[in-house]
Amino acid sequence: MNNKKLETPFEIPGELPFLQAICWQVADVKKLSLKEMLSRYESGWNYWGVLGKPSSEELAFIRQISQYYQSWLIAQLGSSCQPQNSENWVNTQAMFKREIHQKILIVLSHLNVEFLEECRAYFGGGTLVSMEHGEYWLSQDIDFMCPMDDGYRLLRRKVADRGYDAIFANYDSLPYAEQDSLASRITLPNDIQSNQYGIRFPVIVGGTTIKFEMVCEGRIEFGEPKYPNWSPVPCLNQIDSIAEKLLANADRWPSDRVNSRDLIDLAMQRLATRIPQRAIDKAEAAYQVMEPLDRAIQYFQDRPDYRDKCYDILSISQPDKVIDGIDLLAQDLGREITVRTFRETISQFMVSS
């Protein structure tokens, strides 16, 4: 590394305590290029609060380079230089450990939020549930739910007129050029496919293909969305998210190809709270969901080999937590708890530590 003064589009702070902490093996972090600095911040972000914290000047600098290179850290930092509730910020939702979820966050941070709100299209599905509950399984889809009324009609019309320009904010400036961080580059390889059920297209982020869908929902009416502090887009609220999962489980629990992921999502939601009666009522206004839930639980409990397959295919990080949730659901319905395998008794984190 040479000693030539680094030319930058903005001023580098005099001190970079957090960068120096996560780059302890680098004698002078200011000799790193901006892209190298950003890469170190991205890879070391989960050490916030462990190795140290950025100063206010360093936070402003991180935000500047994140915006300049369109990094996923933009969404992590939120709308101001310093995240709200910074004492708890990293411990709760400041960093997604799975790379695919970091890349999903990159896509979310480039969407046209005004368009989503106007169409009442809300982020949901299993990816939302996993990202909200400790990333217990690896989900590679981005699913938005849009009501079957004026919302979906507006969505279809605008997408037909403007294509990707309707869905993405500043579509022409998406991070795909040479100056952008390789891990953050977005490619939209195909045309948008639309029909009466939804619109869909693949998104490639840093070489990883993510399936993007905006689904027309006619079975239930959505309430007001929620805005988690990690999400740059509106999300299904708790009632609607659980109602959607109850409906999805009722539709497809008998199929082994689904790998019981709707039941597993419900189990992890149950760890956080009892299934609200409002969610049950909303789902059952469409069709029966509790009897299929009971049958899905029995099917899952009775087949330990099938459960193992589900854990492997879905990359479940903590099977013991899944069974904790399954047992709560079972007890809610008057069923016995699960006879556990060894894998379901001891946390994988404990085994690997």
Regions found by a protein language model. Name each.
Residues 51-80:
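Short, charged early-sequence alpha-helical segments and their helix-coil boundaries
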Residues 12, 76-353:
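Compositionally biased terminal segments of proteins
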Residues 25-26, 44-48, 145, 249, ...:
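Alpha-helix C-capping/helix-to-loop hinge sites
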Residues 13-20, 35-39, 56-63, 260-267, ...:
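Non-catalytic, well-ordered alpha-helical scaffold segments
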Residues 28-53:
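Amphipathic protein-protein interaction modules
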Residues 3-35:
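N-terminal acidic leader/helix
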Residues 42-50, 66-73, 271-274, 291-292, ...:
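Short alpha-helix boundary/capping elements
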Residues 22-25, 29, 44, 68-72, ...:
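Surface-exposed polar/charged interaction patches
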